């Protein structure tokens, strides 16, 4: 959330607050200054529009609150991006996704602004821990030419950062195989064993200052 202050000699000072910017988004603020012969400050609380009428791209933004409470599995960051409209996993265990029918090798994966897409397969090389993610943007269609060399989607992931106070958390995620449904009957198994999926994952995060107001750290395991 940002604020903008405009001031000029002979005019009233005007401040607009509550301007919220999502990852990859832009906001426009029209500030009008009136003539003034005395000191005066006008504060206007405003928010950027939910629908951006200046672009045709199909974008989905997930903030930290959504990432923390999303009703999805939390074993890889693909569990988050696959929740975006038009995006689906190529397989149940793959490190690649499809967007509106595009091929899996036509996407781009960005982590804190760095391209970590495998050049040959189009997969994501590192898998960011879901609890270390601050914000996610999925450009399903109409990604701007800034990215280039792609016909699919852009998955932009921003990780959490340290602050002036120490904070941390630890989590354990578990899905028992008894929670996985069986799609066949015993007569349809052809005497082959039926293996259900079972997942276990533990995470630990810690962040804080090395030097307050200057240098911070954040780690996730």
Q: In which residue ranges do the predicted regions lie?
A:
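Periplasm-facing N-terminal accessory domains of Gram-negative outer-membrane beta-barrel systems
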Residues: 1-63, 129
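Extracellular loop and loop/strand-boundary signature of outer-membrane beta-barrel proteins
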Residues: 16, 66, 120-123, 188-192
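A beta-strand signature from Gram-negative outer-membrane beta-barrel systems
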Residues: 31, 83-86, 116, 130-175, ...
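N-terminal periplasmic "start-of-domain" segments of outer-membrane beta-barrel proteins
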Residues: 43-70, 104-107, 114-116, 187
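Transmembrane beta-barrel strands of outer-membrane/channel proteins
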Residues: 46, 170-176, 219-221
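Extracytoplasmic beta-strand/coil segments of soluble accessory domains associated
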Residues: 68-118, 150-160
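Short sequence motifs at beta-strands and strand-loop junctions characteristic
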Residues: 72, 147-149, 194-199
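Outer-membrane beta-barrel translocator domains and adjoining extracellular loop/strand segments
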Residues: 180-187
């Amino acid at each position: 959330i940002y604020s903008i202050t405009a001031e000029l000699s002979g005019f009233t000072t005007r401040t607009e607050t509550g301007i919220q910017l999502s990852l990859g988004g832009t906001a426009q603020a029209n500030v009008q200054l009136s003539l003034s012969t005395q000191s005066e400050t006008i504060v206007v609380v405003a928010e950027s529009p939910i629908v951006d009428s200046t672009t045709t791209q199909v974008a989905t933004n997930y903030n930290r609150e959504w990432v923390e409470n999303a009703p999805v599995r939390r074993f890889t960051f693909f569990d988050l991006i696959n929740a975006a409209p038009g995006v689906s996993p190529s397989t149940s265990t793959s490190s690649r996704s499809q967007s509106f029918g595009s091929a899996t090798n036509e996407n781009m994966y960005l982590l804190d602004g760095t391209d970590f897409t495998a050049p040959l397969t189009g997969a994501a090389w590192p898998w960011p821990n879901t609890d270390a993610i601050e914000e996610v943007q999925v450009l399903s269609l109409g990604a701007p030419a800034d990215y280039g060399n792609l016909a699919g989607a852009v998955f932009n992931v921003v990780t959490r950062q340290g602050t002036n106070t120490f904070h941390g958390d630890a989590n354990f995620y578990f899905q028992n195989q008894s929670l996985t449904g069986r799609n066949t009957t015993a007569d349809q198994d052809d005497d082959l064993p039926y293996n259900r999926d079972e997942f276990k994952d533990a995470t630990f995060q810690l962040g804080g200052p090395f030097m307050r107001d200057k240098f911070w750290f954040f780690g996730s395991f």
